[in-house]
Amino acid sequence: MKNILIVDDVKGWRDFCSNVMFEIFGSDINVETADCAKAAYDLLLQAHPYDVIITDLQMEDDFSPKYAGEWLVEQIKSFNRYNNTNIIMISASYNIRHIAEVLEVKCIPKSTALKCLSAYKEALGVN
């Protein structure tokens, strides 16, 4: 069973990404969601390790000058147990590709995310 964490401040996006994960992996997954980076961080500390983490880039403003998603990815990467976790950053931000490249994670612009299931499959390495 795959454990998946979806982090976004917009419930509609959390629901959409959850549905996409069920479509890709079937029903043998456990999906948890968080509405902000801080809540996601708390889950990282107490939950079982996640195989896939999908996070929005822009959420709460508490991490200025960084984006909340940027801060969260840095925290995830500081845990050894997440070394093999697929991390996907989603955002409508114009600079998502640059930030994802610096953080060494996959990214999907939200404009593509709505239209293209294959973008998720490609980011996850799934056929």
Describe the role of every protein-language-model region.
Residues I6-G12, T33-D35, I90-I96, E101-N127:
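Output/docking surface of receiver
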Residues S64-N83:
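Short amphipathic alpha-helix used as the core "switch/output" element in two-component signaling
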Residues S18-N19, T33-V52, D56:
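Acidic, metal-coordinating helix/loop segments flanking the phosphotransfer/catalytic sites
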Residues P49-D51, N80-N86:
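His-Asp phosphorelay/catalytic-motif detector in bacterial-type signaling
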Residues K11-E32:
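Two-component/phosphorelay signaling modules centered on CheY-like receiver
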Residues D56-D62:
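Active-site residues of response regulator receiver
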Residues M1-I4:
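Extreme N-terminal starter segment of soluble prokaryotic enzymes
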Residues G26-D28, Y82-N84, V102:
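Short, well-ordered coil/turn elements that cap or connect secondary structure elements
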